[in-house]
Amino acid sequence: MIQMQSTLDAADNSGARKVMCIKVLGGSHRRYAHIGDIIKVTVKEAIPRGKVKKGDVLKAVVVRTRKGVRRPDGSIIRFDRNACVLLNDTTEQPVGTRIFGPVTRELRNAKFMKIVSLAPEVL
């Protein structure tokens, strides 16, 4: 469950290391974002010469959460850290060209096939 002020790791090579959620998109009073949801983030920590810099505001899709996701068979997939992949604001395509760490199958249903294909492991 990601809400406003939550900090996440950037799971791509866009240049961001830590980002903070400033808005959960998809509804006027929506409080929480789960895996596959789009949020608005600001870059809090970035590496030098990256594609994004500290202070940039852009969209991101949540790919891993501590809360996890429940599957229809009753199993729950949980992760150690909250992580997201930064997206271009207009096209909603990934800013980076590589994805680090596993992602879940739920992203495939949410029309993020580009992220699923770039990921090293799909759970």
From Swiss-Prot:
MF GO annotations: large ribosomal subunit rRNA binding; structural constituent of ribosome
Disulfide bond sites: none
GO cellular component, one term: cytosolic large ribosomal subunit
Annotated keywords: Ribonucleoprotein, Ribosomal protein, RNA-binding, rRNA-binding
PROSITE patterns noted in UniProt: RIBOSOMAL_L14
Top-level division of the source organism's lineage: Bacteria
Pfam (any one): Ribosomal_L14
An individual GO BP term: translation
Subunit: Part of the 50S ribosomal subunit. Forms a cluster with proteins L3 and L19. In the 70S ribosome, L14 and L19 interact and together make contacts with the 16S rRNA in bridges B5 and B8.
Entry-linked NCBIfam families: rplN_bact
Similarity field: Belongs to the universal ribosomal protein uL14 family.
HAMAP family with a match to the protein in the record: Ribosomal_uL14 (MF_01367)
Record function comment: Binds to 23S rRNA. Forms part of two intersubunit bridges in the 70S ribosome.
Identification of the protein by name: Large ribosomal subunit protein uL14
Organism (species): Aliivibrio fischeri (strain ATCC 700601 / ES114) (Vibrio fischeri)
Protein encoded by which gene: rplN
